[in-house]
Amino acid sequence: MKSYIAKAQEVERKWYVVDAAGKPLGRVASQVASILRGKNKPTFTPNVDCGDFVIVINAEKVVLTGKKLDQKMLRKHSLYAGGLKETPYREVLEKKPEFAFEEAVRRMLPTGVLGRKMLKKLNVYRGAEHDHAAQKPEVLELRY
């Protein structure tokens, strides 16, 4: 018996809505990354983008446990000597909660062309409203 290998043309994609209000950032991000990658499907193939589209709402109400709001830093470097910029997650979540969520998911996806394709299927919104009603997304209940 041969193993099934998905073709890019045969993949059927669904749309899901995830409500992140009151849930830990890492737990929501890991499950969203798994769906974007397609690991929830029996036809998962590692070298084919077989994931679904995900809409995340209420990104501003996501929670970080413990002292992570003040101790966890978002780091970026200008590539010049002494060019490290550190911002605590409290400021990041106040100013750009969508960016904080996208960064968490991006770091859980593969690096390279396939990972960038997967990340394009993620739509993150600050509030409860989104622009994708025409796609008829299903509400996705997270496992934990």
Swiss-Prot record:
It holds the Pfam family Ribosomal_L13. InterPro entries: Ribosomal_uL13, Ribosomal_uL13_bac-type, Ribosomal_uL13_CS, Ribosomal_uL13_sf. The keyword Ribonucleoprotein applies. One of its GO terms (biological process) is translation. One of its GO terms (molecular function) is structural constituent of ribosome. Keywords: Ribonucleoprotein, Ribosomal protein. CDD domains: Ribosomal_L13. Gene3D superfamilies: Ribosomal protein L13. GO terms for cellular component: cytosolic large ribosomal subunit. HAMAP family: Ribosomal_uL13. Belongs to the universal ribosomal protein uL13 family. This protein is one of the early assembly proteins of the 50S ribosomal subunit, although it is not seen to bind rRNA by itself. It is important during the early stages of 50S assembly. Part of the 50S ribosomal subunit. This is Large ribosomal subunit protein uL13.
